[in-house]
Amino acid sequence: LPLIDAAADCGCEYYVIDAGWYAPGEWWDSVGEWQECRERFPGGIKEVTDYIRKKGMIPGVWLELEVMGINCEKAKKAPDDWFFVRHGKRVFDRSRYQLDFRNPAVIEHVNEVIDRVVNEYGVGYIKMDYNIEPGIGTEIAAESVGQGLLEHERAYLAWLDDVFRRYPDLVIENCSSGGLRMDYALLSRYSLQSTSDQEDYRNYAAIAANAGSGVTPEQAAVWSYPMRQGDKEEVIYNMVNAMLGRIHQSGHLAELSAQRMELV
């Protein structure tokens, strides 16, 4: 809660709860159901999102809806045609399966998640990540794996269109380990784009300065991570990086000195 207070004091408009809100510990290979973790939120995540709104900000959460971990209980029970399949076996990368958005049951699953986080959890912003490589496609209901991939991608875009029709005020950020999926098939739908997961402000400057060659500045989200300690130029450098696009304010704001907070 102190970090929420500090973000509000800085003038942030959105406050996003990052990865991990759905699990008490390690979660990489078990994601896929996206239910609030009561060990992390004994009073429910709505208690926190309500507090965020009370502080004048719109709450958000991190999701990676296009995948299910190989140890996700729902994935174990789902039929193979929920996922990309090649040579008769589910395709997995980095311990995750790729969902096939041509399947109506998959659409029903992801819509349930979106409806729940918006209507029950009170979320108005989604950081939609994507951290796998689906490969050349799927052989399910296709004459070639490439056809399966293309039809899946078109179905995914159609699903996004439907989400924004149902929730026109919802903001969804396009993210893929940062900026690895920066294209305007997606960005003609998505609200904004993560430009990088780079955490070193000295390395981020070149990324921020060149992001406009791939994405409009008003969609280019750039991180600022002011550190707890250091000279004031570090804070200024962080903030100037982010001011080239959409400021994604991060860092331990509640633990900054008064001088460093004033610079932010």
Q: Could you describe each region identified by the protein language model?
A:
Residues 156-264:
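Active-site-proximal substrate-binding groove within the catalytic cores of carbohydrate-active enzymes
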Residues 40, 44, 152-155, 263:
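Short acidic-hydrophobic sequence patches enriched in Asp/Glu that either
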Residues 2, 23, 37, 50-54, ...:
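Active-site and adjacent substrate-binding regions of carbohydrate-active enzymes
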Residues 26-28, 59-69, 105-117, 171-178, ...:
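Short secondary-structure transition/capping segments
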Residues 38, 100-104, 146-153, 225-232, ...:
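Hydrophobic alpha-helical scaffolding
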Residues 1-112, 125, 142:
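Aromatic-lined carbohydrate-binding/catalytic grooves of carbohydrate-active enzymes
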